[in-house]
Amino acid sequence: MAMFETDPVRPEAYRQFEKPLPEWFRGAALGIFVHWGPYSVPAWAEPTGELGAVPRDEWYTHNPYAEWYANTMRIEGSPSRAHHEAVYGGAPYDDFLDAWEAEEFDAAEVLAVVAATGAGYFIPTTKHHDGVTLWDAPATDGRNTVARGPRRDLIGEFADATRAAGLRFGVYYSGGLDWHFSDLPPIDHDGAPAPDDLAYAEYAHDHVIDLIDRYRPDILWGDIRWPAAGIEPGPKSLVHLFETFYSRVPDGVVNDRWGESHWDFRTSEYVHGTAVEVGEAWENTRGIGLSFGHNRNETSEHLLSAPDAVRLLVDVVSRGGNLLLNIGLEASGRIPDLQRKTLEGIGEWTARHGHAVFGAAPEPRMQASEGPWLRWTRTGDTVHAVIDQEGRVALPDPDGLLDESTARLGEQPIAAERADGAILVDVAAGATPVAVSFRARD
């Protein structure tokens, strides 16, 4: 599969979909992801660490992803199983679907917070690995949020609010796993069986076609992979799915988690799969915390603060990628307070310094550093130095690319002088990085 692979092979049948990456996506810099489902009711996982930092032989039993609760609660000896037995008496997972009310959910309120970050696109989960769909998906026999639980078309509400807020709308769909459709044992190791049969491939195909028909998403964000039986061309194949998508949404994009088939951009996750963060268009995704789904065990020590998130955003953009930052809604539909605080902090920063990331590209001739923390981006003939250090800072410019007489902090000119192959600027104290901009001499 293409996910995390450094040299995936695009089969001949999928070469027809190769095209330049649309500028709206390339310049977006920031997208916001939302994970929300029945797993938001228990909202429980061990906050063990980031994907890529937790040993693989411990990952599944001690999974920090709360959205994996339906799997982790079935693993013998896992803390999630012990928690489930103690708190819920071993009740079936679908009890959480019926207990999920979304009583405080207002899509417009959520999107107002999202839009204030400056994000260019928004992607909610439509079906995660538990198989519950957040719209009235075909052949789900009522196991969806229209017939049970919230009794609402949550995807339709998200789509309308996203477009009203001026953002591009995407949909996440887990094609690689469905713990309800297929009666398979819990996943407790890499390489565990996953649904690959034709029945599931056609079921998933019909779901995504329905999402395209109803909501015209700008982004198809698949996960894990696609069932093997659906890869070869055919009437309900992934080839047909992509043909349908691009015919309806010509400037749409898809990620690389559809098996070894087609992608418009590569993805990494937390600190896993970072080898793909070169060359091609790419996107790093992670939660504000250690989980994508809301996890009641997470505290501020497990979450990105606003300054942390800003540094991550700038770092990703300075290397040519987009950041897809996730929030996990509470079961009620509220954004958790600590996650909201981070989003609001991002918005405050982008209101002042967003010109250094939105529509920006790397400036490879300038060198990043950790001391002081410094990243470089470029928009047109302007180069931006994003600095996280107060006081007098020396910005290395040995080749004289920058015109120091044009130094600006936002719209305000600032003093700058050249000395010993560097430009010296004075930076006021602040909680988050600042962007100093220069006209390039090239």
In which residue ranges do the predicted regions lie?
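Mature catalytic domains of secreted/periplasmic carbohydrate-active enzymes
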Residues: 2-442
